[in-house]
Amino acid sequence: MYNLHREKIFMSYNQNKQYLEDNPEIQEKIELYGLNLLNEVISDNEEEIRADYNEANFLHPFWMNYPPLDRGKMPKGDQIPWIEVGEKAVGSKLTRLVSQREDITVREIGLPTGPDERYLLTSPTIYSLTNGFTDSIMMFVDIKSVGPRDSDYDLVLSPNQVSGNGDWAQLEGGIQNNQQTIQGPRSSQIFLPTIPPLYILSDGTIAPVVHLFIKPIYAMRSLTKGDTGQSLYKIKLASVPNGLGLFCNPGYAFDSAYKFLFRPGKDDRTKSLLQKRVRVDLRVLDKIGPRVMTIDMDK
């Protein structure tokens, strides 16, 4: 099956990748579309999202003796890992809510690697925004839950949460991304993004990748209200540019105007290149354009 549609996909991929690289405004429009879409869906469903997120606290007797393992460094012990609460009560929920929009069709395309939520989104709005280039995007949505002791302006991204330049030179070879040198204030790191900038489906659908990150931020009520539990405080949304925008045209990752957009991650040197993460600074990201949004959920 690997080679059944390979040649036509190869031809279409290179032709359409070049078109996107030559016309970066198309990618920027669909990235803003994806960001605004999630913002609207969250705003329209605030009550449901907040209620289901906070329900985890009322269910305390059911998990208190077998809590999730803390993956942080030197935890104080008074903070419960809330990662999966955000993934289910926000991430999975948003996929369902997006699919219910009148002008949107969602397909859960089989991909063996990628972010928490990944699906093909088709809409006539995309067709209009891209001047008929495509009506579809590959939505890559990751949930990054944080509490009051975590940074709310950092995103820590794995290689499979970032797309690269996406060269496909030989039919048999498949797509390869260039390694990138990430320079931070005090150190540097080699980073290898592992996601292509676009997908071509077997039916000919052109699907540029749109990377969106949802950052549910919870409050530890023991610190703020003299209470117990961890309640949803706010949600940050971020749109990280596609690999073509980052590393090709306009090349945000290399532009001094966005210095330290990427910084070395928190993995030690023993980690494989395919596992080493990188940090994105949301304060720098927001300088590129309307790339970061915040929704107050503490109501």
Swiss-Prot record:
Any one GO biological process: DNA restriction-modification system
EC numbers on record: 3.1.21.4
Keyword Nuclease set for record: yes
This protein's UniProt keywords: Endonuclease, Hydrolase, Magnesium, Metal-binding, Nuclease, Restriction system
Cofactor note: Binds 2 magnesium ions per subunit.
Binding site for Mg(2+) 1: 116, 142-143
Binding site for Mg(2+) 2: 116
One of the record's GO molecular function terms: metal ion binding
Matching InterPro entries: Restrct_endonuc-II-like, Restrct_endonuc_II_BglI, Restrct_endonuc_II_BglI_sf
Pfam families reported in the protein's UniProt record: Endonuc_BglI (PF14562)
UniProt keyword annotation of Hydrolase present: yes
CDD domains referenced in this protein's UniProt entry, alphabetically: BglI-like (cd22311)
Reaction it catalyzes: Endonucleolytic cleavage of DNA to give specific double-stranded fragments with terminal 5'-phosphates
Cofactor(s) named in the record: Mg(2+)
Disulfide topology: none
Quaternary structure (record): Homodimer.
The name this protein goes by in its record: Type II restriction enzyme BglI
Native source organism of the sequence: Bacillus subtilis
Phylogenetic lineage: Bacteria, Bacillati, Bacillota, Bacilli, Bacillales
